[in-house]
Amino acid sequence: MAKFMTPVIQDNPSGWGPCAVPEQFRDMPYQPFSKGDRLGKVADWTGATYQDKRYTNKYSSQFGGGSQYAYFHEEDESSFQLVDTARTQKTAYQRNRMRFAQRNLRRDKDRRNMLQFNLQILPKSAKQKERERIRLQKKFQKQFGVRQKWDQKSQKPRDSSVEVRSDWEVKEEMDFPQLMKMRYLEVSEPQDIECCGALEYYDKAFDRITTRSEKPLRSIKRIFHTVTTTDDPVIRKLAKTQGNVFATDAILATLMSCTRSVYSWDIVVQRVGSKLFFDKRDNSDFDLPTVSETANEPPQDEGNSFNSPRNLAMEATYINHNFSQQCLRMGKERYNFPNPNPFVEDDMDKNEIASVAYRYRRWKLGDDIDLIVRCEHDGVMTGANGEVSFINIKTLNEWDSRHCNGVDWRQKLDSQRGAVIATELKNNSYKLARWTCCALLAGSEYLKLGYVSRYHVKDSSRHVILGTQQFKPNEFASQINLSVENAWGILRCVIDICMKLEEGKYLILKDPNKQVIRVYSLPDGTFSSDEDEEEEEEEEEEEEEEET
C-alpha cells in the first residue's frame, strides 16, 4: 500500500524564501544572468565593419554579468620591439608611402575601435549591398534636393498668381508627368480667316552688332495692345458663324508648354453653350515675361529690389517692347495687311502704334474641335530675291551674370555664343518654349532673338544691345527639345476636359509649388467688374432692339 510522505516545510518567520541553502548548492559560485544574453559573437576576420547604432548594446547583458563572456579584441604586444628613431632624409616616394601607411594604420585603429564597442560586422556580399544602398541614397538626395549644399539658399514657397477662395471647387487635376506623355497628330493645316494690321521692315544693320560695337537701347513710346479673347471684336464676329474654341496665341502657348513652367499662372475658361473661350484676367501678370524662371536658383529678392522676380519681369517687358521697335525701320514704308488694326481708333496717330499684325487662323482638331486663334507678327523681312518673310522679335536680357550660373555675355557672346544660348535654354526654358509656340502658331518664317544687357549690373534702367540671332521656329523647337506633337496633345487634353464641364466660368491654375494644374469652377461674378456687367447689359439691350 502506497505511503504518503509528508514534505519538509521550512518556515521563515522573518522573511520569505528558504531559510538555509541546501547542501548540494552550498559553496557553489553563482552570478546573476539572463537567458536572453548572448555569450559572445563569432569573429569574422574577412568582413568590413560599419557602425549601426541600433545594435550598439546587442551583446551586452542586462545584469552586467554577461560582459565577461563577450569578446574584446586586444592588441598583440608580443611583436613589440625598439626601433631606431634617428631622422633620415626621405624621398618623395617615401613620403607618399608613409602617408598611405598612416592612412592604413588609422583605418585599422578605427576597425579595432568598432570591434571594441560591439559594432556590426558585414560579410563581403553585405558590404557590397551597403555600398549600393549608400550610393542610391546619395543619388536620391541629389536628384530631389533633400540634402542641400552648405552655401545653398533654401527655396522659399512661391505665391499663387491668384488667391484660391474657399467657394471654388476643384473639377480636375492634371500633373505634368501625365501631360508630358500626351501626343496628338490629327492636326489639320492652318487656314487664314482674316489678317489685320501693318508691319515695319527689319533693319539688317542690327545683325552686325557685336559686343565691341554695342548699341544703346532707346526708350520708344509706342502703344502695345494686349487684348484678351472675349474683348477682341474680330473674334466676337467670328464666334457667331464658325468655330467652337477661341483663344490667343499667348494663351495657347502657355498651355502647350506648361510642363516647363515653375511660377504660378492662371487662365480663365468660359463655357458658353457649346463654345469655349480661353481668357486672361484683367490687370494680371500674364503678359510679363519671366526671368530665370527655370534656373537652379531663380531670383528670390523681395520687396523693392530691382532683382526681385516681378521687377525683373517688368524690366524684361520694357526691353522686349523697345527692342522690337528699335530694330525696325521706323517711320518708313510699312507692309499692310488687307484689314486695319482692329484695336486702333480713327483719331490715333499711326506712328504711335507698335508694329504688329494679327493673323486669325483656324485649325481642325479631329471632327469635333474647330479652333480659332489670334496670332501675331512683330515685323517683316525681305530676302535676297525680294521675298517677304514674317518674323517674331523677342529679347533675352542679362541682369547679373554672377547669378543662376550665368556667363558674361560681353566676354562669351561673340566667341562662344553656343554657351550663352545653352545657359539661356537652361534658365529660361519655359519662356523660350512659349515664344517658339507663338511663332509656330503664327506661321512666322523666323524668330529673332536680341541679346540685351544692363549698362551696369546695378542699374536696371539703362541697357545696351550686344547682338542678335535668328532661328527658324521648327529647327529651334527641335533644338530646345520642344515636341510639337506633345504640345498639341496637351492642348487637346485641356480642351476635352473643359468641353465636359457644364456651362459657366472656370479657372485653370498652375500650382505655385507643385507640377500640377487644376481646373476650378468659379461662382458667378468672379473676376467681373461693374463696368463689364454694364457693357454686357448694354450689348444685350442692343441685340434685343435689333431683333424687334
Curated annotation (Swiss-Prot):
An annotated Gene Ontology molecular function: mRNA cap binding
Localization: Cytoplasm
Chain residue ranges for the region called RNA gate: 285-299
Family annotation (InterPro entries): eIF3d (IPR007783)
Domain of life from the UniProt record: Eukaryota
Biased composition regions of type Polar residues, renumbered to the chain: 291-309
Biased composition (Acidic residues): 529-548
Alphabetized UniProt keyword annotations: Acetylation, Cytoplasm, Initiation factor, Phosphoprotein, Protein biosynthesis, RNA-binding
Residues modified to N6-acetyllysine: 53
Region ranges (Disordered): 288-309, 523-548
GO cellular component: eukaryotic 43S preinitiation complex; eukaryotic 48S preinitiation complex; eukaryotic translation initiation factor 3 complex
Modified residue annotations for Phosphoserine: 161, 528-529
UniProt family annotation: Belongs to the eIF-3 subunit D family.
PANTHER family: EUKARYOTIC TRANSLATION INITIATION FACTOR 3 SUBUNIT 7, EUKARYOTIC TRANSLATION INITIATION FACTOR 3 SUBUNIT D
Primary role: mRNA cap-binding component of the eukaryotic translation initiation factor 3 (eIF-3) complex, a complex required for several steps in the initiation of protein synthesis of a specialized repertoire of mRNAs. The eIF-3 complex associates with the 40S ribosome and facilitates the recruitment of eIF-1, eIF-1A, eIF-2:GTP:methionyl-tRNAi and eIF-5 to form the 43S pre-initiation complex (43S PIC). The eIF-3 complex stimulates mRNA recruitment to the 43S PIC and scanning of the mRNA for AUG recognition.
HAMAP family per the UniProt record, alphabetical: eIF3d
Protein name: Eukaryotic translation initiation factor 3 subunit D
The species this protein was found in: Pongo abelii (Sumatran orangutan)
